[in-house]
Structure formats: structure tokens, C-alpha cells
A protein has these predicted regions:
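Catalytic-loop of the protein kinase fold
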Residues: 134-150
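Short beta-strand micro-motifs within the conserved protein kinase catalytic domain, predominantly
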Residues: 80-91
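ATP-binding glycine-rich loop module of kinase domains
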Residues: 28-71
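Conserved short submotifs of the Hanks-type protein kinase catalytic core
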Residues: 89-101
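A conserved short helix/loop substructure at the end of the activation segment
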Residues: 261-272
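Activation segment/activation loop of eukaryotic-type protein kinase catalytic domains
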Residues: 151-182
Length: 278
């Protein structure tokens, strides 16, 4: 990308006619804006390809991710969104979700010497959001704390670019090559190491939710590997099940441990997790 400040694609400007806009994120093939317009408040996602560096191979799929997410939103029956192409990739816009993400909300639990236990009601709202996706026959594939937005009325599960469960246009589709390794289930890590690809599952989503609850409540990753380790080293640690001996305080502890079981068949279902919390 050029060094000049990024701008929204013309087609998005024409569609939304922003009154205000704020660049929230611009890294590794993805830009996100918060946009206010006469139509309402929107998140605008713009993708572009990642060029190869000494540390990273080229990643052309990042250019397709916003349109792929838009196609998923369409299949799931969402409204008030759009997606399309621009000269360096694809874009989408969708309603802005107000609230703090899971990691932000549980920050008081992670303070040194804190006696604050994570609230089971917050965990239950995250479970409900994931359960609604699973009930429609889809898996998320990229469950992590930043993707749960706990709003005033409900919790939203966002960022569906890697979701699987139905057809998306071939021109926007790409293989699943794993997710953020901190939340990647061991079986997913092993498949990516062996073949370069994997098939996301409900069981892997459950693991990722458990890892999300753990790190948000304690500040510790589920698996043990050095801070700043290369992704390959991280993934190898996950694949071998090198579990960190840390537990969530309070009533969530045993449940999160079960969700992080190394064998997918030993993890509770989303229904069982919800029942345990309610």
C-alpha cells in the first residue's frame, strides 16, 4: 500500500456519503473504518493483498476477505450491508456494533492482585452468539476475544470472513489455512502443519471460545510457547498440546478446562456449555 493516508474507496463514499469517518485499523491486508452517515453508523472493511517479506509469504487472500464476509452475511440473512470490489481488493460495510470486546471488558480480572472473577453472564452471552451461528449450520473459524462485542442489549459475534457452512462465490472464496494461533485447536494446527489447510468445525470453535475466555480472564494463553515466537513454533506447540497450567478463577474454571480438551470429541457441545452457564 502507498505511504499516503489511506482513503475509503469511491464506491463506498458514494454509497454511504459519510459525515464523519475514523480509521480504526490498518494492518496486514485489512483496513477498518468507523463511518457515520445519514444511513447510520457503519463498520467499513477494505482488503488488499499482503506482499511477501523476509518474515511472511505473500497473502493474496486478504484482498478477498471483505467480500467473502459479505457473501457469508448474505447467506445468513443479514440486512443493511453491502460488499464489492475496488482496485486493490474488496470491501464491505455493515452496521457498527457498539460495546467493548471480551478482552477489554474483563481487563479488571487481569490486574495484578485482582480478586474480581469473570462474570458467567458475559461468558453466557458469548456462548449464545456462537450458538446462534452454529444453529444456522455455520462455523466461525476465527473465534477470538476481539470478535465478541458485548453491547448494551446483546453480544455480537463479528468478523465472519473465515466462516464455513454454505456456498460463497468462487471468485471470493479461499481455503481455510488456520486462524490466530493463540485460539487454534490442536487438530486444526496439526492439519495446517501437515497440508497447509484445515476444515473448521464446531468443536474447534468451542476450543477457541475456551481459549478466548481463558486469556481474557487471566491474561495467559492456553498453550505454552515463548512470547514473540514465530508462527510455526506457536503452531507446533499447539499441535502437540503443550498446555499452560493456568485456570480461570471462579465457576468458569472447570468448564473452560473441558472446552480446551485436546481431543475434539472430549469437548462439550455449544448446547452443553450454554446449559452449564445457565
Amino acid at each position: 500500500m502507498p505511504a499516503s493516508p489511506p482513503e475509503l474507496p469511491i464506491v463506498v463514499l458514494d454509497a454511504l456519503m459519510p459525515t464523519t469517518q475514523r480509521l480504526v485499523l490498518n494492518r496486514r491486508g485489512s483496513m477498518v473504518w468507523e463511518v457515520q452517515s445519514h444511513r447510520g453508523r457503519y463498520a467499513v472493511k477494505v482488503g488488499y493483498p499482503i506482499e511477501a517479506t523476509a518474515d511472511w509469504p505473500a497473502q493474496p487472500w486478504t484482498a478477498l476477505a471483505p467480500a467473502r464476509e459479505g457473501a457469508v452475511l448474505h447467506r445468513l440473512g443479514f440486512v443493511d450491508f453491502a460488499y464489492g470490489e475496488w482496485d486493490q481488493g474488496t470491501w464491505n460495510f455493515q452496521p457498527w456494533r457498539e460495546g467493548a470486546d471480551l478482552h477489554q471488558l474483563w481487563e479488571p480480572c487481569r490486574r495484578p492482585g485482582s480478586s474480581i472473577a469473570p462474570r458467567a453472564s458475559v461468558a453466557a452471552s458469548c456462548v449464545q452468539a456462537l450458538a446462534e451461528l452454529h444453529a444456522k449450520g455455520w462455523v466461525h473459524g476465527d473465534v477470538q476475544p476481539a470478535h465478541f462485542i458485548i453491547g448494551p442489549e446483546q453480544t455480537h459475534l463479528i468478523d465472519l470472513a473465515l466462516a464455513r457452512g454454505g456456498d460463497v462465490p468462487k471468485g471470493y472464496d479461499f481455503p481455510f489455512r488456520g486462524c490466530l494461533v493463540h485460539y487454534e485447536a490442536p487438530e486444526i494446527a496439526r492439519s495446517v502443519l501437515a497440508t497447509g489447510e484445515a476444515e473448521p468445525t464446531e468443536e474447534a470453535d468451542i476450543y477457541a471460545l475456551g481459549a478466548s475466555l481463558l486469556i481474557s480472564a487471566t491474561g495467559w494463553r492456553a498453550m505454552e510457547y515463548p512470547d514473540g515466537a514465530p508462527r510455526l513454533v506457536q503452531r507446533e506447540a499447539v499441535a502437540t498440546g503443550r498446555r499452560r497450567p493456568v485456570k480461570v478463577r471462579g465457576e468458569l474454571g472447570e468448564l473452560v478446562d473441558a472446552m480446551l480438551s485436546p481431543a475434539p470429541e472430549d469437548r462439550p457441545t455449544i448446547y452443553e456449555v450454554g446449559k452449564a452457564l445457565n
